[in-house]
Structure formats: structure tokens, C-alpha cells
């Protein structure tokens, strides 16, 4: 019973961390990274489709992405989608492929992105804390129904707190790494 609650809480917290890691990966640093375009979509036969499902995205060098669409007619759609995204990128259409150079980030934009990293991280922390609250509520429910003793409940709540502290530390580590990447010139 208690172990199920602990495992469920830990798994849900890990999923929250994965979501946070995905959200942080979408924030542009000065380096080229294929995940940067993961949330950009194009109209592909009437369906909004991520670029990653309609083209190969490769890193040509530290500051340039190469995009090779699987169909020739998609180059212009992909170019338009990247231009209208909020990433501030200007792709170059080479006909059968695209090159996407990453402009250097200015200091003001870096600070905005660091604020965004902090807010995303705080949202991740709140999610983890909500999971802790739910798990503690489940433990209190078991105690109320006399299925566990007070000592077992206290130990379970301590275990949940340890898991929560560990997950929040991992979230902070992800944020610190992203901030370091952003501030590196």
C-alpha cells in the first residue's frame, strides 16, 4: 500500500522532470540543436504536423541546422513555419533543403531567456510539490481508515519528502545547466 503510493509519486515526479527537460530543450541557446524546432508545425496534407515528422533535421555545425524535407514541396512550408515561429530564426531555402543559422544572442535576450528558464523550472517544482501533496493526502487517508499506524504514516511522509527533495534538486540542476548554456558567449 505505502510502497505503491511512494512508487506512484516517484514515477509521476519523474514524468514532471521529463516534461521540464523537454520544455527547457525548446529554449534557444546560441548553439544549434534539432530539438529547437520540435514544437514548430506545418500544414501537412491538412494536418498540423511537427517539422521533425516531415523532415530530417541535422546539426551542420555549432551554429547551423540543416533541414532536408521528405518531400520537395515542403521546403517553402517549413521555411514559412520557422519564420512565423517565435524563435527569431531566418532559414535559407536551398531548393531541396534548408539551412538555419543561429544568430548570436544579445545580452538582453539572454536575460529574457534566463527568466523563462526560471519560470519553467518553478512550474516544474510546483508540479512536483503538488504530487507530494497528493501522496501525503493518500497516506493520511490510509491513516484515517486505520489501515496504517501513525509511525508508518510519519515514515511514509518522510520518504515522500526525501523523494520530493531529490526531484527538486534534479530540476534545479537542469535549470542551472540551461542557464549556464544561455550565458556562455
Swiss-Prot record:
InterPro entries given in the database record: Ribosome_recyc_fac, Ribosome_recyc_fac_dom, RRF_sf
Q: Which GO terms describe its biological process?
A: cytoplasmic translational termination
Which GO molecular function entries does the Swiss-Prot or TrEMBL record give? ribosomal large subunit binding
> Its principal location?
cytoplasm
Which GO cellular component term is one of those annotated? cytosol
Keyword Protein biosynthesis found = yes
Keywords from UniProt, A to Z, are: Cytoplasm, Protein biosynthesis
Q: Does the keyword Protein biosynthesis apply?
A: yes
Q: Which SUPFAM superfamilies match?
A: Ribosome recycling factor, RRF
Its subcellular locations are: Cytoplasm
Source domain of life? Bacteria
One Pfam match, by short name? Answer: RRF
Biological role: Responsible for the release of ribosomes from messenger RNA at the termination of protein biosynthesis. May increase the efficiency of translation by recycling ribosomes from one round of translation to another.
UniProt lists the family membership as follows: Belongs to the RRF family.
Name under which the protein is recorded: Ribosome-recycling factor
- Origin species, per record, is Francisella tularensis subsp. holarctica (strain LVS)
| Upper taxonomic lineage | Bacteria, Pseudomonadati, Pseudomonadota, Gammaproteobacteria, Thiotrichales
Amino acid at each position: 500500500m505505502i510502497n505503491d503510493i511512494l512508487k506512484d509519486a516517484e514515477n509521476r515526479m519523474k514524468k514532471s522532470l521529463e516534461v521540464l527537460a523537454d520544455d527547457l530543450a525548446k529554449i534557444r541557446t546560441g548553439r544549434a540543436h534539432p530539438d529547437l524546432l520540435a514544437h514548430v508545425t506545418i500544414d501537412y496534407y491538412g494536418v498540423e504536423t511537427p517539422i521533425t515528422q516531415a523532415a530530417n533535421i541535422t546539426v551542420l555545425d555549432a551554429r547551423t541546422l540543416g533541414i532536408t524535407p521528405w518531400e520537395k514541396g515542403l521546403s517553402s512550408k517549413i521555411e514559412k513555419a520557422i519564420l512565423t515561429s517565435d524563435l527569431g530564426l531566418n532559414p535559407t531555402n536551398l531548393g531541396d533543403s534548408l539551412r538555419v543559422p543561429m544568430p548570436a544572442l544579445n545580452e538582453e535576450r539572454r536575460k529574457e531567456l534566463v527568466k523563462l528558464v526560471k519560470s519553467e523550472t518553478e512550474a516544474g517544482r510546483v508540479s512536483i510539490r503538488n504530487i507530494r501533496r497528493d501522496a501525503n493526502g493518500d497516506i493520511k487517508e490510509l491513516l484515517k481508515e486505520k489501515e496504517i499506524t501513525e509511525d508508518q504514516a510519519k515514515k511514509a511522509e518522510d520518504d515522500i519528502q526525501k523523494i520530493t527533495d531529490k526531484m527538486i534538486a534534479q530540476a534545479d540542476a537542469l535549470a542551472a545547466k540551461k542557464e549556464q548554456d544561455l550565458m556562455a558567449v
